[in-house]
Amino acid sequence: YSMMKRIFEDRKEPLYGRLTARISLHPFTTTVIKEILADHAPQFTSEDLLCLYLLTGGVAKYITLLMEAKAFNKTAMINYALSEGSPFLTEGKDMLISEFGKDYANYFSILSLIAEGKTTQREIDSIINKNTGSYLANLEDEYSLIKKVKPMFAKPNSRATRYCLQDNFLRFWFRFIFSNNAVLEMRKNHLLTEYVEKNYEQYSGLLL
């Protein structure tokens, strides 16, 4: 996304100003996701629908993968997403490394911390041991991957700021897959599946 944006919107690029139309592709709404799941599994539960939304964020590609794998319920969806060879396991890395370039390790660390609940710059800086202000600004403004949120009950003029990931798929990927890469390298995917199932209720509750 950011690469295409630079090609057409950066004054230094040869194609600057030649864009004749812009189409923004947005994820499916929950209503559309519900219709898709109902077409494949009329007896789906609200838990199945929630899991589909949390795993895919409404992105057509990810929904299609699950539907083609006949992963229509929560357990099947999680099992497929975390199974050996699943496209879900490498998607975050494949999608973002080329975007971030040589700084990808710093960006990945920041996104992983936010997904794990370290949502203030002070917390992130203290763990990474460097000022991450410029990285956070890029993640918000250039890549549109995070956004600022105000804590509940904060005063309107409060400067307290927290960050959250905007994409549900990436939130799941950084929370469970990227942070447990060592388990996957040992090919013990079943342990990761058990970990996700153990923490799923708390994780899904935070996103409702």
Residue ranges and their predicted role:
Residues 1-12:
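Sensor-1/coupling segment of RecA-like P-loop NTPase cores
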Residues 44-49, 53-65, 104-107:
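The conserved phosphate-sensing helix
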Residues 62-208:
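Accessory nucleic acid-recognition modules appended to NTPase machines
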Residues 1-2, 28-30, 152:
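Short acidic/polar capping segments at secondary-structure boundaries
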Residues 25, 54, 127:
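Small/polar loops that bind or transfer phosphate-bearing groups
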Residues 8, 37-39, 144-147:
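Short, motif-level signal for alpha-helix interfacial/capping segments enriched in acidic residues
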Residues 20-48:
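Conserved small helical "lid"/interfacial subdomain of P-loop NTPases
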